Amino acid sequence: MSQLDALREMTVVVADTGDIEAIKQYQPQDATTNPSLILNASALPQYASLIDDAVAYAKAKSDDKAQQLIDAEDKLAVNIGLEILKIVPGRISTEVDARLSYDTEATIEKARQIMKLYNDAGISNDRILIKIASTWQGIRAAEVLEKEGINCNLTLLFSQAQARACAEAGVYLISPFVGRILDWYKAAEKKEYAPAEDPGVISVTNIYNYYKQYGYQTVVMGASFRNVGEITEIAGCDRLTIAPPLLKELAESNAPLVRKLEYKGEVKARPAPLTEAEFYWQHNQDPMAVEKLAEGIRKFAVDIEKLEAMLAAKL
């Protein structure tokens, strides 16, 4: 049995890509996209018609150039999502514009708009996750959306404070990052880490155990992997979203896979929810998390602007 098949027996495997061919090849349960992946996917020749459709939709909806750009961007992300939903049996994660990461109301509105585009295409809410950065404002937006029946995937999650606040808000799923945490520690400490000592692996392990210990239903989906060792060290996590090159490596390996994450303790009474002040104080105590959250939002915003430049040339 390949490591990928062994992993499927203990963890829901998700593909972290917008590439339809890769998804067909590895048959994941779900798929996740982000602005960077949408940008990469839109350069593939098979997506030209999806871009043309998004542009035509935006032109028909508004005469205002700025509004056309916003509409085309949303429609392109949804068009790619719709193609992926033809292949995966589960859910697609589609991300809210990262530039709205500190605006609760604008995030809620954008999430509703994305969901309406999916609904108009005949897709029900239970096949979509709206991806939102795990800022305090993003978590508050998700809290409102969850009550409306719009499930969220809180991403760019690097600190225990972020994870705790998401669970307390009743968020459907979180994406704690592994590889980007490792990147930070390698740069800061000038050293290499074995998978079992990988700070990203330790972070996800702690979050997983915290959630199970307090009986939170929020799904933990490890994300952002730099190597297969990081994946095998958190085998047993609720879900793992994995890029095609690492899915390939897992599919080609027959090395034994041992379940690493499994909580067997009793469920304890939950602490009082974090206040906004406590959230910021605790998150701020982790310089890695502060830097990586800010950097992640900036990088996604840069890729959204590149995507907009590509679309603007067609509008």
Curated annotation (Swiss-Prot):
CDD domains assigned to the protein according to its UniProt record, in alphabetical order: Transaldolase_TalAB
Keyword Cytoplasm: yes
Active site: 131 (schiff-base intermediate with substrate)
GO molecular function per UniProt: transaldolase activity
Enzyme class, broadest EC rank: transferase
Organism superkingdom: Bacteria
Catalytic activity reported: D-sedoheptulose 7-phosphate + D-glyceraldehyde 3-phosphate = D-erythrose 4-phosphate + beta-D-fructose 6-phosphate
Family assignment from sequence similarity: Belongs to the transaldolase family. Type 1 subfamily.
Function: Transaldolase is important for the balance of metabolites in the pentose-phosphate pathway.
Name of the protein described by the UniProt record: Transaldolase
Organism: Actinobacillus pleuropneumoniae serotype 3 (strain JL03)
